[in-house]
């Protein structure tokens, strides 16, 4: 597993992330290559091609979106828009048809309106993530959000929104996983669940 906060931003001299995937996949004895967590705005066509072409690269991707609202993404300083995220997911799914896609979603971030939240719900319904890590926002000292933005969404509302998206994702995950019923696939057991 290649691990980094923005792992796909890797560059060293003339080597980019796609080259790194190819180099790791070429190592004798390597049968499975995974990586986490890529940054949406740094995903290149070369990286998508490497994922699609290399049988060692698992067709699974954790691609954090955080919110379905452009205004929230801007407040979070994410550096990409929802339309850019949608476009990236479309390109990934076109290149890797059985891609398993997971994400991170935060509700109750500073200034999140009801419409911002509804945009997140609609994005989840559209993207149909296989799974998602979902959180309610809480202040972290030392961050730009803590220094510059008021934590103005009431805690009860954060919890209500979190419960709603968890229920939605559980339903989506159940539906998405139905595609595997009755199929035999190769798996790697990593330990007891």
Task: Give the positions of each predicted feature.
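OB-fold and OB-like beta-barrel modules that bind single-stranded nucleic acids
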Residues: 61-63, 132, 187-189
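Terminal RNA-binding accessory module
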Residues: 145-193
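Conserved SAM/AdoMet-binding glycine-rich loop
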Residues: 1-114, 125
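C-terminal, non-catalytic macromolecule-binding modules
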Residues: 115, 119-165
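Short capping/connector residues at structural and topological boundaries
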Residues: 12, 62, 78-81, 142, ...
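Active-site/binding-pocket entry motifs
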Residues: 8, 140, 192-193
């Amino acid at each position: 597993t290649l691990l980094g906060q923005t792992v796909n931003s890797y560059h060293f001299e003339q080597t980019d992330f796609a080259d790194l995937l190819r180099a790791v996949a070429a190592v004798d004895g390597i049968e499975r290559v995974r990586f986490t967590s890529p940054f949406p705005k740094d995903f290149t066509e070369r990286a998508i091609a490497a994922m699609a072409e290399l049988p060692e690269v698992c067709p699974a991707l954790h691609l954090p979106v955080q919110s379905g609202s452009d205004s929230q993404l801007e407040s979070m300083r994410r550096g990409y828009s929802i339309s850019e995220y949608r476009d990236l997911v479309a390109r990934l799914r076109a290149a890797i048809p059985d891609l398993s896609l997971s994400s991170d979603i935060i509700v109750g971030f500073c200034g999140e309106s009801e419409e911002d939240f509804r945009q997140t719900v609609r994005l989840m319904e559209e993207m149909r993530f296989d799974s998602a890590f979902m959180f309610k926002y809480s202040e972290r000292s030392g961050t730009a959000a803590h220094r510059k933005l008021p934590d103005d969404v009431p805690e009860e509302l954060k919890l209500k929104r979190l419960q709603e998206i968890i229920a939605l994702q559980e339903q989506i995950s159940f539906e998405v996983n139905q595609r595997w019923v009755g199929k035999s696939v190769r798996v790697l057991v990593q330990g007891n669940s």
